[in-house]
Each structure stands twice: as C-alpha cells, then as structure tokens.
A protein has these predicted regions:
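Short, aromatic/basic amphipathic alpha-helical patches
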Residues: 96-103, 167-177, 261-275, 292-297
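A short alpha-helical cap/connector motif
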Residues: 1-157, 161-208, 487-496, 501-511, ...
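Catalytic core and acceptor-binding pocket of nucleotide-sugar-dependent glycosyltransferases
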Residues: 164, 359-363, 381, 387, ...
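Active-site-proximal specificity loops/subdomain of glycosyltransferases
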Residues: 271-344
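GT-A fold catalytic core of metal-dependent nucleotide-sugar glycosyltransferases
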Residues: 324-383
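"A position-specific structural signal for the A-helix of alpha-solenoid helical repeats
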Residues: 479, 483-486, 522-529, 533
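Well-ordered, non-membrane alpha-helical segments in soluble/globular domains
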Residues: 170-171, 228-243, 364-369, 443
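N-proximal low-complexity "stem/linker" segments adjacent to membrane-targeting elements
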Residues: 205-237
C-alpha cells in the first residue's frame, strides 16, 4: 500500500468542495439545524472535511467507518464516489433517508470490537487504506491490538482522544508516540488522532525534542502540618489525575519520594523510559541554593519558620496552603535549577508542568504541543490578575491577603532565563521569610517581575487556561479583560494593558476565540484609551 504525501495536509484540505453535501444534510436535518451547522463547520471544530479529504487520496477501494451514529461520518467518507464505505454500529441511528440511500455507503449492524465478528470482516479490514473510529474509550485498545496482530498496514482516525478521560487513559496514551499523531487542529474540537503501524505512513508532527519538562509528586499528607484539605487530596486523588502528565511524550524529569516512586514508575509508559529521569528524594531533604551554594537549612526548618511567621503576622489564606504546601510550590524552582544544571537530555528549553495538569481541563492537553513548539526563550507564564506595583512594594499590606497575579502551574523558558528567574524567585522567598512573611510562590512573581520585567514574556488567561492560551486566546477571552486589562489600565500600566489587548485582539481576529459585542467594545475602549496615554497611533 503506497502512502500519500501528508506533508501539506492542512493546505490540501481546502480543495474539498463540501457543498455537494448541502442538499443531503439539509434534507436530513430540517428539524435539527444544529446538525447542519455541525457537519459544515470548519476543521478544528468538526472533522468531516478531514474525512472527506482523506477519501480523495485513494480510489476504487474500501473505507471502514466504526460508529455510524447518525451517518454523518459515513457521508463525509463517501465524498470520493469511486470508494465504498462500510459503516458499522450496534444500533441503527441513521434517521436521514438521504444518507441511508447513498450509493457508495453500506450500513451494517455488526460489532467489530467483537473479535469473532472482526475476523469475519478481516479481509475487508486489511484492504481498507484507513479506518475511522468513533466510539467510547473502553474497547479501542483491544481493536488496536487486533489490527497489530493481523498486520494491518493502513491508518486509523480516532475521535474524542482528549475530551474523554477514558479515551486518554485507556487508549491514546497506551499507543507508543512513534505510531500516533495528534491532528486535532484539522479535526474535531474534542480531539482527533491518527495511529498507524506502517512506518511508511507519516503525518506532520512538531519536533519538541529540545525540551525537558519537570514535574513532581510528594505525599504531603505525611507532613506534620497536613490540614484537612491536604488530607482530602491524598495520593489516590493525585495519581488518578496524573496520567496526562506521566504519559507526555517528551523528555521528563520526575521528582518524588521513595514511597511514591513505584506507583509513578508503573504509570509512566514503558515506551517513554528513554525520555525519563527519576530523582528520588524525601521532601524534607530539599535545600535552597543561593549564589550557587546549598543553604544549611532543609525544608523541615523552613516549615517551622513559615508557621512561626504566620502566627506572628496572620493573614487570610486557603487552609490547603499549609507551610508544607508552600514549600512544595517553592521546590519547583529548586528542581528546575537542579535539572538545568544536570541537563540529562541536553535540552535548550525547560518547562514546569503540574503533576495533575489534567484537572485544569482537556483543552490544556490539546494545546501543549503547540505551546512548546513556540520555543519562547524568556520566562513565560500566564498573567491572570494585575496587582499594581505600589501595592506590591507595600509588603505589609501586600501580605495581608494571598494576592497572586501569575500562574505557577505551567511556565517555560530557555536554560538561561528559566534558571535566572527561578533563582530570583527563591531569593525573594528567602527575603520575605526573613522579614516574617510567607504565603504562596505565586505571590513572589509580581515583586520579581516588577524588578526584572525584561526577563518575562506573558500570555493571558485564567488558571483553567494556563496552557490553553499560551499561543493564542483559545478559550475564555473575558477574564483577561476584567481581571487584567481593566486593572492594569486603572493603575496606569498602559504598556501591559496594550500588550494584553493586542494579545486578545489578535486571537479574536484570527478566529481563535469568540467574544460578545459587549466585551469586544470594552476591549476596544481600553485599547484605544491606553494607546492615547502612550501617544501611539
């Protein structure tokens, strides 16, 4: 089976004339207008144009569609009328008579996940250059193994690889990275992936080999200051949300305690062993480093000091933010500095990613690969809430509440900028502890930034968009407007206000996000007024 050239697939998809389906879909769904819009929606929102395009790459052959549902995928696959589409489902849900009578589509009530049934269709499967798979995440891996066992030489398009945790954990992450491709930007908003066991079939894939990502898990429920909130989020909780980080197909350094290591080792896919470095250390054994020298006090000593500071200078904070939790957050910077020094994968760029990043939503998982491909050099993090510089300089007032302006769950930079900013954050921590304060690592970002703004490159969003909005505002453009743009304007930081406005506007004009007229007008207002203050056209 000769493989087509997929290198320009995004451009080539534009040649598909989808209007030929207009009458078929309209006739079918007069009472369901959303179904009409769904079918004709653009790549990245719906996958039907991708399926139609792929059908044009092969002639006079058989295409398999597993999961007929309403018949829309079979309809798209029927675009090239020289091919025959065999569409399978265990229930008949094709209500559209125009779809049912398509001359090159045959619908079957058969379960191809039953291996006895699959064997009945084995010859047809082997003849099919590609298969479309749209089911539920519980049986796909068995079908993958079946295709592997019979020597299937085509490729399989899979729907919903990101949205459903079952699809991610039980299927997508179990396929070695060398065999799979994420084509969500060409397919469905919920995640579209392609896998193939044929080394001659290759789809475009970003090269993110220059990165080392760092993550960590320590069981803070064992710490002497574990609060009820900490205990509720025990090891079971974090491990249940860990696979999206542990299955990342990048160079990954994992810090953990001895107790957690076996469980983490079992969850990191074996095919990624060559891209994995484990550093095992008990939590209280961490030390900060100042001017290149490890300080004498370990985390146990700092925990006592932070608790003393909080008694002497009480403030309002979340009970989950114990002194040990604060120190865990601070360990990020010590771990990144150490990783940069060791540099086991000879990387140029480094990234912190939370162990349980999937809790922030599937869209962050979708956008991670694109975010890394940008290869920003400066320290880059999500600016969430503008805290004015005069308030930051008033340390006593600043520390009355947990005022956190930037996100520490995901941040990036090259070796130079990452090490420099991590070092500055550590130094600022030590400075505030000595002054009798201590809240959270994110509260250290603003004072470091205002003193070293040249080291930072921001993007904008809220916690749930800490990766999603790295390149563009893909989700929720409103929080940057009311949390950052309005507040930076009100506090006369017109440079950052304009920067944030342009970041949101660019995303909107490139159709990366939607925005109501109300918010768009508000955005324009602040943008134009801020530019007036800067005397820029």
């Amino acid at each position: 089976m000769t493989s087509p050239d997929f290198s320009n697939i995004k451009h080539d998809m534009e040649t598909v004339d989808f209007e030929q389906f207009r009458q078929i879909i309209n006739v079918a769904n007069q009472s369901l207008p959303d179904c009409i819009h769904e079918f004709f929606d653009v790549p990245g929102k719906q996958h039907y144009r991708l399926l139609a395009y792929l059908s044009t790459l092969y002639n006079n052959t058989t295409i398999i569609d597993i999961g007929s549902h309403r018949g829309n995928s079979a309809t798209a696959l029927s675009y090239n009328t020289t091919n025959t589409v065999h569409s399978f489902d265990i229930e008949d849900k094709v209500l559209n008579p125009a779809i049912r009578i398509l001359p090159n589509v045959q619908f079957h009530l058969d379960n191809l996940f039953d291996l006895l049934v699959a064997d009945k269709w084995k010859d047809t499967i082997l003849q099919s250059p590609f298969i479309f798979l749209d089911v539920n995440g519980s049986m796909e891996i068995d079908f993958y193994n079946y295709l592997k066992s019979i020597g299937y030489a085509g490729f399989v398009i899979c729907d919903d690889i990101w949205y459903f945790k079952e699809m991610r954990d039980n299927f997508w992450y179990k396929i070695p990275d060398e065999y799979r491709y994420d084509v969500t930007e060409l397919g469905h908003w919920s995640g579209t992936g392609i896998f193939t066991l044929n080394p001659d079939i290759r789809f475009p894939k970003r090269d993110n080999s220059a990165w080392t990502l760092v993550t960590a898990y320590f069981n803070l429920t064992k710490c002497p200051d574990a609060s009820e909130e900490i205990i509720k989020r025990d090891a079971t909780y974090y491990f249940s949300h860990s696979l999206s980080t542990l299955a990342l197909p990048y160079n990954l350094v994992i810090y953990c305690d001895n107790e957690s290591y076996p469980e983490i080792l079992s969850r990191r896919p074996e095919y990624l062993s060559s891209r994995t470095q484990y550093i095992i250390r008990e939590f209280d054994e961490f030390h900060f480093k100042k001017d290149g020298v490890l300080l004498d006090d370990n985390f146990a000593k700092y925990r006592d000091q932070i608790n003393k500071n909080r008694r002497n200078k009480p403030y309002h904070f979340d009970n989950r933010n114990t002194a040990s939790y604060y120190l865990f957050c601070m360990s990020r910077y010590a771990m990144l500095k150490e990783t940069i020094e060791l540099n086991p994968f000879k990387s140029s760029h480094f990234c912190w990613i939370n162990f349980c990043i999937e809790r922030m939503g599937y869209q962050n998982l979708i956008r991670l690969d694109e975010a890394l491909s940008i290869k920003r050099n400066k320290f880059s993090t999500c600016y969430i809430d503008y805290v004015p510089e005069p308030l930051v300089q008033n340390t006593e007032e600043y520390y009355r509440f947990g005022r956190c302006g930037m996100c520490s769950g995901f941040f990036t930079g090259n070796a130079h900028y990452m090490y420099k900013v991590c070092d500055l954050i550590e130094n600022k921590f030590l400075e505030y502890v000595q002054q009798g304060y201590g809240h959270a690592d994110e509260q250290l970002y603003s004072p470091v930034y205002f003193q070293n703004s040249q080291l930072f490159e921001h993007y904008y969003g809220d916690y749930l968009q800490m990766i999603t909005n790295y390149t563009y505002i893909y989700d929720s453009p409103e929080p940057p407007i009311y949390n950052f743009i309005t507040r930076s304007f009100d506090n006369a930081n017109y440079v950052k206000c304009v920067e944030a406005c342009e970041f949101v506007l660019k995303s909107y004009f490139l159709k990366k996000c939607n925005m109501s007229d109300e918010y768009l007008n508000e955005l324009y207002h602040y943008y134009m007024e801020a530019k007036k203050h800067l005397h820029t056209p």
